[in-house]
């Protein structure tokens, strides 16, 4: 029985990156032998065991055979005579098909070390095309390793996989899982670019794909292209280390611009309402978590008016705060402001160092929350008038704030 560290642990160590988890391949063993050594079985589809001391995963060397469409149609074969090279051959990219033995010697039958040095994502074998999830994985790796490029032959294979309908068999949960992981990488825009380059974005997220090439007014968007603007906004969210809900919201905030009538371009009147509807549809189709869905819908609907805090009437500001449930959910409203700030900062040309509307909205929210709704309700004889009285008091509080505004700070 021989054991080897494989995959991401070897790759990251060679790149000088921290190694969080180690996966092992075991050659020359049977499940019974693993059990006799105290390993605990955890694999459902193929033999995977946890080491009795380290709890690290040890998988018996195996080969794979395609049996159907999509990512689930595989048959696995494990036996003591399956070699390490055969196990590595089933992996997606050469940089993930490197093993290290107990002495530290690298086993690299497919040129992964050379591709690490060349900063290239290259598929190990034509079997790459058997699993459409690999398209999403390559795109996610592009978001993590920003200085890598996809080998031309690998990109061509990915395009062929899209053309033959393999990606259409991906289940929503798996698409969301890979999208979410990619969005949380350092450069999520690169994930979107790779998916677009191979044609997968048009199949998986057509609402986003159609934004590319749609013009916007140069006065507000020097970058012109709506798709490019969205990627700049997502990059702003990543640069500020925002949470997944904020990053998802920035990705979907302008979807409605893809449905703007051509006759009114480059203007996009009413795109916020269209964007909110599409953000909900996309989030539900991909089965995104509720917090991601709700924030995306609200940011899409409100990002335009949030940017206008300086010119809004007190009445309008209070209506927005009430509509966003900001009094009960101030933390979520703060996330909306963060996403709206990314929208403002994620564009071409010169940008101010901070986004002033954030401080204006937070000050207005504080003023509204200072209104004692309970006291107003107790003092009002006509209970039917209580909501209007409370609303009027909130408007008065914001008007008073406008008369003596706090120092402008904003989100930098």
UniProtKB/Swiss-Prot annotation:
Record's keyword annotation contains rRNA-binding: no
Cofactor comment: Magnesium is required for nucleotidyltransferase activity. Nickel for phosphatase activity.
Ranges of residues in domain HD: 226-327
Enzyme Commission (EC) number: 2.7.7.72, 3.1.3.-, 3.1.4.-
Binding site for Mg(2+): 21, 23
SUPFAM superfamilies: Nucleotidyltransferase, Poly A polymerase C-terminal region-like
InterPro entries: CCA_bact, HD/PDEase_dom, HD_domain, NT_sf, PolA_pol_head_dom, PolyA_RNA-bd, tRNA_CCA-adding_enzyme
GO terms under biological process: RNA repair; tRNA 3'-terminal CCA addition
Record key words, sorted: ATP-binding, Hydrolase, Magnesium, Metal-binding, Multifunctional enzyme, Nickel, Nucleotide-binding, Nucleotidyltransferase, RNA repair, RNA-binding, Transferase, tRNA processing
Reactions this protein catalyses: a tRNA precursor + 2 CTP + ATP = a tRNA with a 3' CCA end + 3 diphosphate; a tRNA with a 3' CCA end + 2 CTP + ATP = a tRNA with a 3' CCACCA end + 3 diphosphate
Binding, ATP: 8, 11, 91, 137, 140
Complex formation: Monomer. Can also form homodimers and oligomers.
Note: A single active site specifically recognizes both ATP and CTP and is responsible for their addition.
UniProt record similarity statement: Belongs to the tRNA nucleotidyltransferase/poly(A) polymerase family. Bacterial CCA-adding enzyme type 1 subfamily.
The record's note on its domains: Comprises two domains: an N-terminal domain containing the nucleotidyltransferase activity and a C-terminal HD domain associated with both phosphodiesterase and phosphatase activities.
Record's protein name: Multifunctional CCA protein
